Amino acid sequence: MALSFFSGGGSASYAKYFDIRLDEGYIVFRGGEQEAASAQLSGKLLLCLSEPLAAKHVRLNLTGISRVCWHLPSGSASGSRKSWREKVFYEKTWTFRDAGKSKTEVLAAGNYEFPFHVILEGSMPESVEGLSDTYVTYRFKAEIGRKYAKDIVVRKPLRIIRTLESSALELSHAMSVENIWPNKIEYSISTPTKAVIFGTSLRVDFKLIPLLKGLKIGQIVSQLIESHDLTLNPEDPDSIRNTYKSTRTIVSDEYELDDEGSLEIIDEEAEGYQFSRYLDLPKTLTRCLQDTDTRGIKIRHKLKFRVQLLNPDGHISELRATLPVSIFISPNLAIDENNNLVDQTPQTARRAVDDIAQQAPPLYGEHQFDQLYSEVDPSGYRTPGPGSGPGTPFGALSRNISSENLASMNALTSTDLSVSALQTRLSNLHASRFSNPSPTEIDNHADSEQRRLGISTADYFGPSSGSNSHSPASPELSRRPSDEGYRDHDHIPSGMATPFHPQYAEVETLSRVPSYSTAMRSTVRPCDSELPDYQAVVAEDTAMPALQSPQQAYIRSAGRGTSMNTGIDVHQLRSGHFSSRTSNSHDEEDRRLRLVQARARV
């Protein structure tokens, strides 16, 4: 409320303009009181003086007040009995000028701007306005104190809106009630979402399938009911609270079906009625409040339905159902100081619904007061946890997931991972590339290791393998993933060299990747020193042997009545079963002669 001039005597006419101007028209909290982030309130106090003004102080005060009140009818002639309680729960004062006790300060003519700002906690109560004697309000009061004249005062309300987050379940979950009344009707009544924006419309979908021949649907009544639960002392225990409950009807809709035009096939099975009804919500808070529960004021909404069933024998039955709904205020629909929507056109309401459905993530500026990551306790967010075993085997390659190795898994927690063990594995892997042991050497080495570890070398399917290979008494079947366990962990069963608490600092050191400049300065080592480089291969004058198709010889026996085919396949020739691949010309002619003689005898 801006003052352009002041009536009365004295120097009151010197203040030509005095107003409170906010950077934002209202404060928005997204989420409940326990989860909403803080918000910044900022603005300016503007003062325009045409002549000097003597003032004791210039102050701005923000006050939050809650009031709960109700009237109970009384039998006396005085009328009703009133119960009420008012409390100031928030107060903030900015002092821009203060001359001191019993002193004044002369403000020269000109324009003055006094900026102010404050951080409002997300747990602060939201504004509740619309009831006559019950409310939660925030009001600014700017004051210029004067010594020998009336103080100059201007007031401005502040509205705090608590709305739903875009990820709230109320915005995505449909509410429905469906059931079957035996030998009467099958019904389903639903709403697309539980949450509804204040000032928009509420859609209700009906599906009614009569199960009794000759049953007709009568009048269908839909009502939006608002319940008030007021408490004078909400901080006290439930047993001693002074409460008052009341309800009122916000919207009522009556509808009758057209039996001939509305009947249709539903779900390709039964005939019934399927339709939708729209309930337009009021555009003012005096007729409909938002859902809230703060400062002893609890507001809730629900839909009530009554469906008349006209039975063939003439009597009337009634189907009753209820659905909970939640009404919230959208920041996209502005509300004026008289608690009415500023823009009440259907296009604006449709736009607000679409904005909620396609809401983008909040801007960066709306999260400048969120909790920092450094303030979050990281316990429980890092993996692996203290109780997680890092040595889980591959199911296709290990039998450690079966029951016979449960006992051996206990040894998993008794070892530790060291850098030397990793280096040993790498060196063994590198050394194995240069050595090609014969199969006999490998078998002898495996037999010696099995004898040292006490593992039987009998056939797995032989008699000595036991009747059941999955017996819990065979933990020795676990496999060792690497070779250093033979030397470093001789006392641990096979496969039990995986640590429980690895030394992550040493592992990170080994897995550190050098920078690009460091890699460019280092020399490139060949993967295998015995392999020739590219220049050596190009310099050699190698003659590629001519490729020949596979051959197979068939030799018949000397007898006419019997024959025997002896086939020699290419795989055997290439595997070294014959010492020579070619023969001289004499051997070739001799072989051809024998073939001709054999054919002549046949």
From Swiss-Prot:
Region (Disordered): 375-398, 457-499
Listed InterPro entries: Arrestin-like_C, Arrestin-like_N, Arrestin_C-like, Arrestin_domain-protein, Ig_E-set
Composition bias type Low complexity, residue spans: 463-475
Signal sequence extent: none
GO MF, one annotated term: protein-macromolecule adaptor activity
GO cellular component, one term: plasma membrane
Pfam families: Arrestin_C (PF02752), Arrestin_N (PF00339)
Keywords from the UniProt entry: Ubl conjugation pathway
Biased composition annotated in UniProt, kind: Basic and acidic residues: 477-492
Described function: Component of the regulatory network controlling carbon source utilization through ubiquitination and deubiquitination involving creA, creB, creC, creD and acrB. May be involved in signaling by recognizing appropriately phosphorylated substrates via its arrestin domains and then recruit a HECT-type ubiquitin ligase such as hulA, leading to ubiquitination of the substrate, providing a link between ubiquitination and phosphorylation in protein regulation and stability.
Assembly notes: Interacts with hulA.
PANTHER family the UniProt entry points to: ARRESTIN DOMAIN CONTAINING PROTEIN, FI21816P1
Family the UniProt entry places it in: Belongs to the arrestin family.
Name of the protein described by the UniProt record: Probable HECT-type ubiquitin ligase-interacting protein creD
Source species of the chain: Aspergillus clavatus (strain ATCC 1007 / CBS 513.65 / DSM 816 / NCTC 3887 / NRRL 1 / QM 1276 / 107)
